[in-house]
Amino acid sequence: RKTVIAAYDELMGQGWITTIPAKGTFVSDKLPEVNPRGKGVEKGPESAAGFSFEVRKHLHRPYAQLPSMLTIDEGIPDVRIAPIVEILRHYRSIISRSYNAKYLSYGSFFGDDSLREILANYLQETRGIACSKENILITRGSQMGMYLAAQLIHQKGGFSIVGETNYIAASLTLTDAGASLLRVRVDENGLNTNDIQALCKKHKIKSVYVTSHHHHPTTVTLSPERRLHLNELAHQYGFAILEDDYDYDFHYQRAPLLPLASADGGNHVIYMGAICKIIAPAIRVGYMVGPSDFIAAAAHLRRTIDRQGDTILEKAIGQMIEQGDLQRHSRKALKLYHERRDHFHQLLNDHLSEFISFQVPEGGMAFWVKLRKDLNWGTIAKTCLENELVIPDWKNYDSSNSGHNGIRLGFASLNFQEQTKAILILESAMKKESEN
């Protein structure tokens, strides 16, 4: 009965039928006009737009999601161990209370106030960053923070310094914002700050992008001496340090070095992190920490592209931090990923040592692996794909054409069995390539 009534309502709303009281429902005397598609004209989802627009080709990167295939990623968490039960428990407890219905409406474009306050304490305790909620903007992940910072700093162009090897998404974001990239060497101690100083003497530098804890992609840690030097240069030359601390929580050898933001006495560091890097990529909650006037400007810019995040999820994450759920998950994940790193290291030694060179990362979720110069990652990747293994695209790691022949191989999201299977396929592909 409900279906029939709904159908009648729809037909009446479109003008196909008319109801006359005490008589019945009849086909309308004047039917709605239907304009059939022109003969021979086909329109589908892949049709070209009938208007002009800008295609930013420099942002286009191939992306193929192949969930049915075994994948060695760039280094992401294992979503199978994500604390979903805890997240849902907190989410339900918030949304089930009638007086919390207000959280389903529009909220602050700075992010949930309670999470900002909780994060201020959390970042002080875990990273030594002295801040208040006015210094924090809740984002949908560190990439949003990177976009907002780049747009505000480089709206009128200017120079940004990045590593010779660099996180490609950051390079693209800076370039798209209008920055001209200047590259410096990266060695076992991270970005070469003497190179940065030399560039500062030649150009007006607006920003320096750094992944201080584990350089992306090579995984090296910026040394204490270079951290101090970089902060001094920022104060001397007045540039912003864009510190992307994407995997601070995963360090296996010792306690991690505190971020640059913890020793920022002149308000030059914009610090970006993400809860999704600890839990799972789909849990889109991150944060940006910086001077309060900059955070306010970023919040107003954020309002134009996203308005706000998921208030209830943000509150749930705040409760997880307050009650220690996030910290317990981090400790559990750290132990597991440490074991997986060691197992992956053994597999690389046992099966791929004649083809590659690498250093064991002290933290993070990936190895930086350099292939022999006579071998080609592109051919190897194609052979792997034929055997249902996906590996990262080597082109993402050498945008400056330095010829290092390296890629990142993530280990955290694969259990021992999956790691073994993947490395055996990779070994077979490398043997085939070396024989040709």
Predicted segments, located by residue:
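A generic "structured core" feature
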Residues: 169-173, 230, 237, 241, ...
